[in-house]
Amino acid sequence: MIEFGKRATPQSAADAVRGDSGMASGMSAGAMATLAQSAASTHAYYDTTFSRRAMKVLPGEYSVTTEDLMLVTVLGSCVSACVRDKTLGIGGMNHFMLPSRNEGESILSPSMRYGTHAMEVLLNQLYKAGAKRERLEIKVFGGAAVLAGMSTLDVGERNGKFVLEFLRNEGLTVAAKDLFDVHPRKVYFVPSTGQIMVRKLRSQNSAAELDSEAQYASKLSKSITTKPASRLQLFT
């Protein structure tokens, strides 16, 4: 295991967009629904290994918490950004991938806009909770080459490069990263302290989680629209 380093609010990104009046995503309803499954599918549990209350963040979801809560996800080709306000100890995690499309890698392409949306939803929810841009600590994980039949598309590498490019374009510093490779990862993030533990999964125990990621990838490819999507405004 590698170590880096009130109320939890797991939500769908579609709900977050609907809550921001005057902001239109330009995505189809199907794409927005796929971006984050319903909040009910993000599971709260007690983690006996770490003796902590925890919340699972599944593919397409994000969660923001102001409590002493551990956020947990399993990543294959998807990526997660773990973001916290170092002063307030509030933070959040997302779990997403870019839809596969036969297009250029421009940051303005439809699938790249989809990734931008996933990142901006998380950041906006943190800003609304009181986080400040200048106090953000950001660590990113995932992007492994693990999805069967998709390795030739460099899905994981594409996702990892996207999140790094997004943060660079936004002028946000990456404090730590663990990207690419061929092994799935289980990420444990405690926003209140900034502690992150990453376990590389080298067995088949993560098959169920990776199956859900593959299903998520399939839905993305079918639901993403080529209609231009507006960037969300970042509130700082």
From Swiss-Prot:
Database matches in PANTHER family: CHEMORECEPTOR GLUTAMINE DEAMIDASE CHED-RELATED (PTHR35147:SF2)
Top-level taxonomy: Bacteria, Pseudomonadati, Pseudomonadota, Betaproteobacteria, Burkholderiales
Domain of life from the UniProt record: Bacteria
One BP term from GO: chemotaxis
InterPro entries, sorted: CheD-like_sf (IPR038592), Chemorcpt_Glu_NH3ase_CheD (IPR005659), Cytotoxic_necrot_fac-like_cat (IPR011324)
Protein name per UniProt: Probable chemoreceptor glutamine deamidase CheD
Catalytic activity: L-glutaminyl-[protein] + H2O = L-glutamyl-[protein] + NH4(+)
One Gene Ontology term of the molecular function aspect: protein-glutamine glutaminase activity
Matches recorded under NCBIfam families: PRK13487.1
Protein encoded by which gene: cheD
CDD domains registered for this protein in UniProt: CheD
Keywords: Chemotaxis, Hydrolase
Region (Disordered): 1-20
Function: Probably deamidates glutamine residues to glutamate on methyl-accepting chemotaxis receptors (MCPs), playing an important role in chemotaxis.
EC code: 3.5.1.44
Source organism per UniProt: Ralstonia pickettii (strain 12J)
Family designation: Belongs to the CheD family.
Pfam families registered for this protein in UniProt: CheD
